[in-house]
């Protein structure tokens, strides 16, 4: 079963996976421009012709489709989690959750921005996560 923290971190996890896939796609695209033409010469044996450029284009196309699906899943999951966070009634706890799990800010940075000590912010964060736990019914 998923913990509350795992549930909330899904947005950032999806985002990181998408960024990595985009890097992979960029590398493949770069590689595809460096695929050289196969020299045509005498052939001793006939075999099935390979099309390295076509193979590369197909891989890039498949990867772009995968990225598109991941982005769609990311947007759905993000919307779901944001709606869950919006159910937290205390505005301070809402702000902490939004900054931490939607904007990916550290608790230290949030504490600094909001004018609280790190220890107080950690306590408030635990309280905020407990609210989400109640809303979602996790870890009963």
Question: What is each residue range found by the language model?
Answer:
Residues 1-84, 130, 136-140:
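N-terminal interaction/assembly modules
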Residues 77-80, 91-93, 124:
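N-terminal positioning helix adjacent to the helix-turn-helix/winged-helix DNA-binding module
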Residues 87-90, 134:
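Secondary-structure boundary motif
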Residues 89-103:
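Short amphipathic alpha helix immediately N-terminal
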Residues 109-114:
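Short alpha-helical "recognition helix" segments of helix-turn-helix
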Residues 121-132:
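DNA major-groove recognition helices of helix-turn-helix
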């Amino acid at each position: 079963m998923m913990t509350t923290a795992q549930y909330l971190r899904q947005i950032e996890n999806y985002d990181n996976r998408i960024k990595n896939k985009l890097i992979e796609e960029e590398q493949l695209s770069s590689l595809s421009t460096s695929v050289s033409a196969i020299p045509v010469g005498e052939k001793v044996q006939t075999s099935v012709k390979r099309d390295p450029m076509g193979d590369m284009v197909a891989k890039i196309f498949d990867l772009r489709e995968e990225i598109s699906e991941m982005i769609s899943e990311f947007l759905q999951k993000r919307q779901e989690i944001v709606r869950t966070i919006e159910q937290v009634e205390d505005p301070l706890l809402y702000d902490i959750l939004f900054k931490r799990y939607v904007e990916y800010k550290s608790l230290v940075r949030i504490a600094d921005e909001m004018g609280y000590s790190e220890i107080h912010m950690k306590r408030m964060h635990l309280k905020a996560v407990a609210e989400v736990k109640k809303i979602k019914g996790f870890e009963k």
